[in-house]
């Protein structure tokens, strides 16, 4: 293709436009940002409202049936499975973000491993600094390198000094 470099440039920059001095118009169709939240905890309810306001596609995964209720989580995808089961059945992309909220390594870490392997654009994990240190140590023991592990934002959140779900 004569204009391969120009087409690649538009694609990589995720923009649309006319290639200089031609009549070729490039239109990029960008998949919406998808945010996968692991953990149907009280914090998730507030986070979901924020993400929906940004027009992100939101999916909540939690294998614990008593946390997942349609009353708590309306108008979003709710998956009552272990994260590794869910990730086997869906396709994710570089437009996918992961936020883990359960504090349970048996639930959070399989999702984190998948996100690291698939190079999600954002990976965040809730928990204390000590919890995050332990999480990183276990991931390193499982073969992930420092660069991969350092791509996990953790502990996530902004220190406002509060303890309520919206503040967390």
Task: Pin down the residues of each PLM region.
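Segments forming oxygen-rich coordination pockets for charged ligands
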Residues: 1-63, 67-76, 93-96, 131, ...
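Short phosphate-binding/catalytic loops that engage adenosine nucleotides
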Residues: 56, 120, 144
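General small-molecule cofactor/ligand-binding pocket signal
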Residues: 59, 79, 153
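ADP-ribose/adenylate-binding Rossmann-like module
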Residues: 61, 97, 102, 113-138
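Cytosolic regulatory regions of ion transport systems
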Residues: 75, 106-113
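Conserved SAM-binding strand-loop segment of SAM-dependent methyltransferases
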Residues: 76-82
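Short amphipathic alpha-helix with an adjacent loop that forms part of the alpha/beta core around
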Residues: 84-94
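Adenosine-phosphate binding glycine-rich loop
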Residues: 126-168
């Amino acid at each position: 293709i004569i204009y391969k470099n120009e087409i690649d440039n538009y694609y990589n920059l995720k923009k649309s436009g006319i290639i200089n001095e031609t009549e070729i118009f490039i239109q990029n169709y960008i998949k919406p940002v998808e945010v996968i939240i692991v953990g149907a905890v009280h914090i998730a309810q507030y986070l979901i409202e924020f993400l929906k306001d940004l027009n992100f596609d939101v999916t909540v995964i939690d294998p614990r049936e008593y946390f997942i209720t349609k009353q708590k989580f309306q108008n979003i995808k709710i998956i009552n499975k272990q994260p590794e089961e869910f990730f086997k059945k869906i396709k994710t992309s570089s437009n996918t973000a992961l936020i883990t909220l359960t504090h349970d390594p048996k639930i959070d870490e399989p999702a984190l491993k998948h996100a690291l392997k698939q190079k999600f654009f954002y990976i965040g994990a809730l928990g204390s600094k000590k919890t995050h240190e332990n999480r990183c140590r276990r991931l390193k023991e499982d073969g992930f390198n420092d660069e991969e592990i350092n791509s996990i934002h953790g502990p996530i959140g902004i220190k406002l000094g509060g303890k309520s779900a919206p503040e967390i």
